[in-house]
C-alpha cells in the first residue's frame, strides 16, 4: 500500500477552491491568489537542455500549454533560461527561469519572468522535498505579505524532437520580486552585500526567527544569499525589507544533498 503523502495532504487542505476571473489575459496578482493546481506542459529540446544544463544563462525556446481556471486556454511560446548554482550541477533538471513575456501576444505575458522550481530527481522522496519547500512558502505567506507567493503545477516536460521520453512531475512557479514589492507599496532594490543592521529590524527579526524555525542556515543578507530587498516607495527614510527564498537546504525539507553550515 502506497504511503500517505502528509505534506501533500496539508497542501490539499490549504489549496481551497478560489474563483478565477473570467478574462482572456492573466492577472499577475490573482494568478498567485488562486490556489488550484495547474496541469501544464512545457515542450522544448530536452536533449539540448540536459546537455547544456551546467551553463548558467543558456536560453532554450519552448512552449507552455495549460488550461487555467475560468477556461483560459494557454498555448504560448516561452523562453527557458538556466539558473541556479548547486542544484544546476547536482539535479537531473537544472533550475529554470520561464520568460512568459517572450512574445507580445502571450496570454501569460503579465507574469513576466518567473522562477520554476522543480524536483531534483524523479523519485517519490524528491517529490516530498518539493512539497515541503512549497509548504514553507505557503506558511511564510501566512506570517507576512513580504513573501514570495507560489503556484503548484502538475507538470509534463516534453521533448520537441520526440527523442526523449516525457517527464511528469510536480513543480511550482515563484512570484517575481517586482510583484512582491508592488503588493507592499514598495519597489525592488538591487544591491550587493548588505549589513543586517541597515535593514528594517522588525522584518529582519521575522525572517531570522522563521529561518531558525525551519532549520535553514543557507541564507544571509550580509552575503546577498537567498534574500531579496524591497524598499518603500512612500518613505525615503524607511530601511529596506528582507524577503527570503530557496528553502531546500532547510532541516524542514531535509533533502539528501543539504549540509548545514558550520
Model-derived features: positions:
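Phosphate/dinucleotide-binding and metal-coordinating scaffold of catalytic cores
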Residues: 22-262
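Bacterial Sec-dependent N-terminal signal peptides
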Residues: 1-23
Amino acid at each position: 500500500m502506497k504511503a500517505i503523502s502528509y505534506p501533500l495532504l496539508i497542501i490539499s487542505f490549504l489549496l481551497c477552491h478560489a474563483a478565477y476571473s473570467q478574462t482572456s489575459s492573466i492577472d499577475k496578482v490573482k494568478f498567485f491568489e488562486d490556489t488550484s493546481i495547474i496541469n501544464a506542459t512545457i515542450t522544448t529540446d530536452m536533449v539540448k537542455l540536459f546537455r547544456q544544463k551546467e551553463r548558467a544563462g543558456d536560453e532554450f525556446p519552448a512552449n507552455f500549454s495549460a488550461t487555467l481556471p475560468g477556461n483560459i486556454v494557454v498555448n504560448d511560446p516561452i523562453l527557458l533560461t538556466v539558473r541556479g548554482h548547486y542544484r544546476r550541477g547536482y539535479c537531473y533538471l537544472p533550475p529554470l527561469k520561464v520568460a512568459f513575456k517572450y512574445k507580445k501576444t502571450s496570454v501569460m505575458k503579465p507574469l513576466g519572468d518567473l522562477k520554476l522550481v522543480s524536483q531534483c530527481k524523479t523519485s517519490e522522496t524528491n517529490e516530498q522535498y518539493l512539497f515541503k519547500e512549497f509548504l514553507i512558502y505557503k506558511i511564510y505567506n501566512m506570517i507576512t505579505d513580504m513573501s514570495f507567493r507560489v503556484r503548484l503545477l502538475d507538470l509534463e516536460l516534453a521533448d520537441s524532437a520526440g527523442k526523449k521520453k516525457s517527464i511528469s512531475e510536480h513543480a511550482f512557479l515563484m512570484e517575481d520580486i517586482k510583484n512582491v514589492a508592488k503588493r507592499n507599496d514598495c519597489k525592488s532594490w538591487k544591491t550587493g552585500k548588505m549589513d543586517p543592521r541597515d535593514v528594517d529590524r522588525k522584518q529582519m527579526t521575522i525572517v531570522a526567527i522563521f529561518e531558525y524555525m525551519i532549520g535553514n542556515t543557507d541564507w544571509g543578507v550580509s552575503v546577498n544569499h537567498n534574500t531579496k530587498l524591497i524598499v518603500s516607495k512612500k518613505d525615503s527614510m524607511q530601511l529596506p525589507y528582507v524577503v527570503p527564498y530557496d528553502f531546500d537546504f532547510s532541516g524542514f525539507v531535509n533533502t539528501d544533498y543539504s549540509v548545514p553550515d558550520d
